């Protein structure tokens, strides 16, 4: 995420110095080209929850999603460093198709839950079989943070990106309790 924000900041700064000749769409295209993927540069530039996918014509499709105002995100940032390359090393080269299907289904529940504020859909949608089983062991105390957040009222808790930050989703009224857990 930090490289993406640096790229976006550099592009916005350069564009401003040149009296903003490039529209946001072109800045987005440049940011994706520089970073190599849209995962972090898109929300860094557009803000909010963004979905990205490469289409059959090899162009990036970007969709900004609604996020119900009753749902808040709380992020715990541990005082450890974890490089993306280190986090990628623990990932298997292949995963069972059933795990991939499970994650795709969970994503549909999560997105609908975030849009509608449906707590049960968010809880069910925060289930992951592709990344977290391998990456939690890299974040010392991470599972304790997850348990504390859930016990404090979080609807779900996950590793943010490659880690080590941990994201909890909660109802607005539980945000303070979750953040103090």
Question: What are the residue ranges of the model-derived segments?
Answer:
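A short glycine/serine-rich beta->alpha loop
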Residues: 1, 29-38, 93-98
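Short glycine/threonine-rich catalytic loop with a Thr-x-Gly-x-Asp
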Residues: 1-5, 97-101, 156-161
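DPxDG-like acidic metal-binding loop motif
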Residues: 2-23, 45-47
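Alpha/beta catalytic cores of group-transfer enzymes, especially the acyltransferase/condensing modules
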Residues: 21-71, 143, 157-159, 163-167
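Short beta-strand-to-loop capping motifs
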Residues: 54, 78, 168-172
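Active-site rim beta-loop-alpha module in soluble metabolic enzymes
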Residues: 74-137
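Glycine-rich, charge-dense phosphate/pyrophosphate-binding loop(s)
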Residues: 114-181
